Amino acid sequence: MTPIRCLLACLLLLAAAPPVAARTLEVGPGKPYAQPSQAAAAAGDGDRVMIAPGEYFDCAVWPQNNLTIEGASEEGTVITDKACQGKALFVISGPNVTVRNLTLTRARVPDGNGAGIRAEGKTLVVDHVRFINNQDGILSTDEPQGSITVRDSQFTRNGACEKACAHGIYAGHIGLLRVERTAFSETRRAHDIKSRALRTEVVGCTFVDGPDGTASYAIELPNGGSLLAKNNTFEKGPKAENHTAVIMIGSEGITQPTREIVVEDNTARADGDYNTVLVYNQTATEAVVQGNRLSGPITPLHGDGSAS
């Protein structure tokens, strides 16, 4: 057989070979991998990483595609105190990753942006994850075609403004940020959600400062971008860092299209001794602010649009 025919035959055999089966990698005491970082080094595309209950003083970098990282329970599986690459407890650079049933806590780095998750891939789903006492809960890089979906999760006592401000969720220039049925509480000085996404959707969430929370805005879209905020509950507390608004749009200049702004069927309460606004719109897009229930010294809209 000539070398060319041999090469072609080998290529045909490779093409006909079945795909490598996805594996489940088990992490924990007595498991094949003692720490999440060990599983991260061994995992391949399509694998599932199962982390047993316990407290792991560890961090991990996940470059794999189509990966699922899952704890045994939302409260019982805790990743804490370490930061990989000077960034986060979990640095996720692979596309199509799901993180589920974990607590990510106490992320700190010298630049002030230590995150529970640093999202650097194309598609990330976060499901039933608690982010507690981090500088950033989730911090993403720019990925114009990317999306982040957060659902049924909890962000508590995140945020910092020691250097640059860090937030509960800070989305860079991505295609879509969607947050569903998620609770934000006691955010420190910064915003619960800061999003530079082309489209941001916040549905069925709660934002509570309480008596001691010092959050600035519940939702900020500093560069514009479309917004749907529906069926949420907002409580702006007496120690809020910024009294101007609950939702702020365009505070750093409009640099991307804002196709629509819809804020509807929310409940908003201002508990402080100050006046505030539900939606502060600095774009030329007319905001639709409707069906919201307001209490305390709060008005529905400043800027272009209509309130009903």
Enumerate the predicted regions with their spans:
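Bacterial N-terminal signal peptides that target proteins for export
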Residues: 1-8
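N-terminal signal peptide c-region/cleavage motif recognized by signal peptidases
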Residues: 16-17
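Flexible, charged surface loops at secondary-structure boundaries
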Residues: 21, 41-45, 62-63, 92-93, ...
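Acidic Gly/Asp/Thr-rich repetitive segments characteristic of extracellular carbohydrate-active
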Residues: 24-52, 56-58
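Extracellular beta-strand-rich solenoid/capping regions of secreted or surface-exposed proteins
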Residues: 45, 56-70, 78-100, 105-123, ...
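Right-handed parallel beta-helix
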Residues: 53, 70-78, 95-106, 123-133, ...
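Extracellular beta-strand/beta-solenoid scaffold signature
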Residues: 81-90, 110-118, 133-142, 161-171, ...
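Leucine-rich solenoid repeat scaffolds
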Residues: 275-308
